[in-house]
Amino acid sequence: MATGFASTGDLAEKKVTFSEIGPDLYAFTAEGDPNSAVIVGDDGCIVFDAQATPAMANKVIERVKAVTDKPIKYVVLSHYHAVRVLGASAYHAQGIVASQETHRLIVERGQQDWDSEYGRFPRLFQDAQSIPGLTWPTLTSR
């Protein structure tokens, strides 16, 4: 007998923290949720992992604006999972950076992963209508 994922019943809000973990290095975390990291550079910021939706990404953006007025120039995607990348459009970044392998996996299974994670993590996708589509890297590396 198959059972559903425990995460489908996880609808309670999580406590979010935004902590400086090093000079100009911040961690956006919530228990059990995807994390984002932020580096504040000389003329802009880099965000690592975008969050599941633009609405969730806006929570990261609010925290970044509380510590700097520098623009978010780049979003780096660590891998292709929907809960980490579909919020990228909210940043209006100069570039979306990912490995060539991440790009390949988005092509191969991005929509399938989105559909799967949407069903498994309803709390993370409460604002799914804000997602304009799959996230495509504009800069790739090996």
What are the language-model segments listed below?
Residues 4-5, 29:
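Hydrophobic small-molecule pocket/channel-lining residues, especially in calycin-type beta-barrels
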Residues 5-20:
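Short acidic, Pro/Gly- and aromatic-enriched capping/linker segments at domain boundaries
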Residues 10-12, 30-32, 132-133, 138-140:
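Short solvent-exposed loop/turn micro-motifs enriched in small/polar/acidic residues
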Residues 18-63:
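Conserved beta-strand hairpin/beta-sheet module of binuclear metal-dependent hydrolase folds
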Residues 62-141:
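Active-site HxH/HxHxD metal-binding segment of metal-dependent hydrolases
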